[in-house]
Amino acid sequence: MPKLAGSKTSENLKASFAEAAQASRRYLYFARQADIEGYADAAGMLRDMAEGEANHSLGSLDFLREVGDPATGKPFGMTQQNLLSAFQDESYQGNEMYLEFARAARAEGFDEVAEWFETLARAEKAHAERFRSMSAQLFED
């Protein structure tokens, strides 16, 4: 059987995962707006579609276990691996990515967006700590 790592199929699985995961979240956002506007049937349909897209993303992620977490490249699948990969991704987002996004937004004059990114950085740091703490609780003697 061919190796998935480094293949075009691996890249396509990563793209499929990202697209379906983003669609799921967008559809939930759209459903909230439909609720606000009083369109209960549309909101329900959007939630159903969001669940379907979430399942599509999980199917692609199952194949990617052979390659590594699409966000970190680290092994994932077992809880200890998953917690470590999640910790590393949240740490990166909180300590680097969102702070850089905030700097860029501020440099372009988007102070409100910069503040949002700084809020996200703080949240991601807190998430990283939760992942670290759970990993320590479960897997460190």
PLM segments and residue spans:
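Non-heme di-metal
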Residues: 1-141
